[in-house]
Amino acid sequence: MSRRSNTVSRPTKPDPIYRNRLVNMLVNRILKNGKKSLGYRILYTALKTIKQKTKKNPLSVLRQAVRRATPNVVVKARRRGGSTYQVPIEVKPSQGRALAIRWLLSAARKRSGRSMGLKLSYELMDAARQTGNAIRKREETHRMAEANRAFAHFR
């Protein structure tokens, strides 16, 4: 067991334009090779596209998409008596939000198309409408947790 004390998680800073922490969390996950300005450009393009297509506030669409893609439970593999069980575990809100962001971005990257900004905007709009691959991933995770509910006491 570690003797170190638990680290205090630093609050993420809000982004410069929308002054929103969620936007900054999304930008930090978009990054490749540390190019933060490119991450901002991709996300702002996506938000601009959302505003043009839906005529709604893009931040509310983003929040709704993340909220709908956030899982309540996940399954973790636990070894017990020589066999591996998928054990359902409840997720903290911050961890769930991080998973939702990760799933939204991976679903956007898998979409066909040229620019990441457009792919991300379509994935966010789909997630806000309860469709899309990120929502499918969440439902699949919930189904797995429900199927393995009998192993919940293995924690």
UniProtKB/Swiss-Prot annotation:
GO CC terms: chloroplast; small ribosomal subunit
Disulfide-linked positions: none
Record-linked PROSITE patterns: RIBOSOMAL_S7
Subcellular location: Plastid, Chloroplast
A matching Pfam family: Ribosomal_S7
Domain of life the protein comes from: Eukaryota
Role: One of the primary rRNA binding proteins, it binds directly to 16S rRNA where it nucleates assembly of the head domain of the 30S subunit.
UniProt protein name: Small ribosomal subunit protein uS7c
Organism encoding this protein: Spirogyra maxima (Green alga)
